[in-house]
A protein has these predicted regions:
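Conserved helicase/translocase motor-coupling segment
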Residues: 2-89, 94
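Terminal low-complexity/disordered tails
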Residues: 150, 161-211
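Generic structural motif recognizing short loop/turn segments at the entrances and edges of beta-strands
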Residues: 18-22, 119-122, 200
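Activity-critical C-terminal alpha-helical subdomain
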Residues: 55-173
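Charged/polar, solvent-exposed surface patches and flexible loops
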Residues: 9, 35-39, 114-117, 134, ...
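Generic hydrophobic secondary-structure signal
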Residues: 10, 53-54, 90, 97-102, ...
Length: 211
């Protein structure tokens, strides 16, 4: 939800919101990758038109270069499966036509290659290996408006950002039921400022837009 709001606010500032349909998966990144990615790579429309913007803490920095694969590696299902895990940070199953003798190896290899190509072309990450809640709390508005709460922590981190938001919600609304309202407000205020995070998200959006 927070990532969706950040991306939509930046799109709005760039006058590009009408070109995108931003959706978020409430199950989190791992569910998104393990459940939906196998479907994405089976449809040309999804492969060409669906892009993933994932929380920065999921970024693995894995570099996939198809040209550097040896013939042996290309035909090794265990190796290719491990490449997929190194890229995405999670195990993603290859769904193949089974039978008494199990799935077809060539089909499995093709799916792993599709996963890796999709990773290279269509998967993007929020900047600085940050989760969206951390990005929002690093805004000047948040630091000034909620200084007393934020200063209770030594630093804003991926580990404590959601708890800080919960504390702010309790201070503002008396409970944690309004975290989404708080996120929407913070995303709006954050988008009005200039920051390196915002600049990197603009670059990410432009890269997707050109595709």
């Amino acid at each position: 939800f927070a990532a969706k709001n950040i991306v939509e606010q930046v799109l709005g500032r760039m006058n590009k919101l009408q070109y995108f349909d931003v959706e978020f998966n409430p199950g989190g990144e791992k569910t998104l990758l393990t459940k939906y990615l196998p479907t994405f790579i089976t449809h040309d429309f999804f492969k060409q038109k669906v892009f993933l913007v994932i929380d920065g803490d999921m970024q693995t920095d894995y570099i996939y270069d198809e040209d550097k694969l040896t013939v042996t590696q290309e035909k090794d299902t265990v190796y290719m499966k491990e490449c997929v895990k190194k890229a995405y940070g999670v195990d993603i199953k290859a769904y193949v036509d089974g039978g008494k003798n199990g799935g077809r190896k060539d089909q499995e290899l093709k799916i792993y290659r599709e996963y890796l190509n999709y990773y290279q072309n269509s998967v993007f990450y929020l900047p600085n290996k940050s989760i969206p809640e951390k990005i929002l709390l690093e805004s000047q508005y948040a630091k000034e408006q909620y200084k007393d709460i934020i200063d209770l922590e030594k630093n804003i981190t991926n580990e404590n950002a959601k708890n800080i938001l919960a504390t702010i919600s309790e201070a503002d609304y008396g409970n944690t039921d309004h975290i989404n309202d708080l996120i929407q407000k913070l995303a709006y205020k954050w988008s009005m400022e200039e920051s390196s995070n915002k600049k990197m998200i603009e670059e990410l959006i432009n890269e997707i837009y050109k595709k």
